[in-house]
Amino acid sequence: MFNIKPLSSEFEEAIQQKIDTKTKPLGALGDLEGLALQIAKVLGKDNPQINNPKMMVFAADHGIASSGVSIAPSEVTAQMVRNFMAGGAAINVFTRQVGLELEVIDCGVLQPFDSDSGVIDQRLGAGTGPIHKRAAMTLGAVKQGFEMAADRIQLHHQNGCNLIALGEMGIGNTSSAAAIMSVLTGVAASDCVGRGTGIDAATFKRKQMLIEQAVLLHHSELDDPMQVLACIGGFEIVQMTGAILAAAERGMLVVIDGFIASAAALVAVNINSHCRDYMIFSHQSDEKGHYLMLEYMQAKPLLNLGLKLGEGTGAALAFPLIQAAVNFYNQMASFEDAGIEI
């Protein structure tokens, strides 16, 4: 489905040598050095540059939300999308600060937006089915979502973009993400479920029960990652998964945000493991299962700020660190350049 090349180790030694001979002790820049190595392997060992980076926020509603798994009703998804378009959300503040161009994609919010809203229409439906009662969507919808996401990535790639950052908005989407995590990692559903938007103990218990119910209901159909998306996914999770795979196929870096985006990354890795090479995990969120999911994918996040918002906020906040890794690799003098003998 996606022809993703594993990263070649051909130039890894030369890249590491360039990092090691900068005017610093070996390893002194810590995790930035590993990040620079990854970026240079993806974008090229000679003067890699991040060009036309994009923050893509995917929005959709979830049928399970009507069963009371969140403090917020489903209507808040559309209200927050309008807030994004008005420039008033945290993701707007952070993308403006770090110089990321933001776009918002409607993958399946309950009510469609006006054509002049500025929201990109990639709707797969008006919210998913309630996953604890029936499948979220058809397999055809999953495939259509992948195609839509790939078309959007291709457009950005044609315009010179070589890095995308992923965010999301969707009341109820931590429930789908937790169910996906449980199925694909084997971790008990109860250990994947977090408080999401800050629910109370009774709501938390109901959320755990409904997710366990969803996993049990669909267990006979969950042996394929595409079917996992169809049974327990979300329209925005589908399109984030497609975007990851399409971007990796085109040799682009993909910055993963929090728990929901990481669930999409987990599905993508199960579809084609080579896409993992192109992912940068921006942060570990405060959501209960996120650190276990990151551990499963052998991902070391750049930040750990206790964030629990989504929207792409962690990915935006990590972007200056990604740029710093590029800049030190390209601009920092070597001992030889500086005339320093050790």
From Swiss-Prot:
PANTHER family per record: NICOTINATE-NUCLEOTIDE--DIMETHYLBENZIMIDAZOLE PHOSPHORIBOSYLTRANSFERASE
NCBIfam families noted in UniProt: cobT_DBIPRT, PRK00105.1
Family assignment from sequence similarity: Belongs to the CobT family.
Keywords, in A-Z order: Cobalamin biosynthesis, Glycosyltransferase, Transferase
Top-rank EC class of the record's enzyme: transferase
Record-listed E.C. numbers: 2.4.2.21
Catalytic reaction annotation: 5,6-dimethylbenzimidazole + nicotinate beta-D-ribonucleotide = alpha-ribazole 5'-phosphate + nicotinate + H(+)
Active-site residues, Swiss-Prot/TrEMBL: E311
Function: Catalyzes the synthesis of alpha-ribazole-5'-phosphate from nicotinate mononucleotide (NAMN) and 5,6-dimethylbenzimidazole (DMB).
Molecular-function GO term, any one: nicotinate-nucleotide-dimethylbenzimidazole phosphoribosyltransferase activity
Source superkingdom: Bacteria
Gene this protein is translated from: cobT
Lineage: Bacteria, Pseudomonadati, Pseudomonadota, Gammaproteobacteria, Alteromonadales
Key word Metal-binding present: no
Protein's name in the database: Nicotinate-nucleotide--dimethylbenzimidazole phosphoribosyltransferase
Keyword Transferase recorded: yes
GO biological process, one term: cobalamin biosynthetic process
Pathway the protein acts in: Nucleoside biosynthesis; alpha-ribazole biosynthesis; alpha-ribazole from 5,6-dimethylbenzimidazole: step 1/2
HAMAP family attached to this UniProt entry: CobT
